[in-house]
């Protein structure tokens, strides 16, 4: 069975960079990213590995909702300029990169789902909880920084929902980290309570007459922003990609 390790490039690099005392010390970032990548290869023993990077084109999500990810700290210039050397260092060790046109998340989701549909296994290395919406069969979410599998079931219990309700939950409650708005006045607890009772967003909107007047009004007035929030949170798993998996094949790692 083919086993693909997909590393969310900027997620890894920016977190490594953030803990360094000198933000201009890109050589240390380079060394640590390579060491981390080698460690993952040794741990997971994949047949293929790729590092997926965000591109520079504007995200379609930003076009849909201009405040998407608003206020997020820009990448330091030294790090941005150093990415080309980081990619080159990885490539020297047969860890090849794939550059997305815009956000890496949709590319990662597309590649992962295609691999799984072809009876392969996938490990996604990222701390981005958005990947928890993907089907879990033959898919592992690996948190390199905590050295553990991201437990989707535990995350669902924490939110008080089931996996299939994840996008409906964000449509209602939003996602502050990505500046996805959700419906004003509907917080995580209310969203979970509503989904526990009505199961899906569609069924909830068919049942507004069964709610109190105040809550029903909030939901009615927020229907369009809920639709937008759902779309913003939803990973695209069908992006056309010109990619040959053979270029990402790696030799077995022994040390």
UniProtKB/Swiss-Prot annotation:
Keywords: DNA-binding, Endonuclease, Hydrolase, Magnesium, Metal-binding, Nuclease, Potassium. Residues 163-253 form the 5'-3' exonuclease domain. One of its GO terms (molecular function) is DNA binding. Its EC number is 3.1.-.-. Binds 2 Mg(2+) per subunit. Only one magnesium ion has a direct interaction with the protein, the other interactions are indirect. K(+) binds at residues 172-173, 181, 183, 186. SMART domains: 53EXOc, HhH2. GO terms for biological process: DNA replication, Okazaki fragment processing. Belongs to the Xni family. This is Flap endonuclease Xni. The gene is xni.
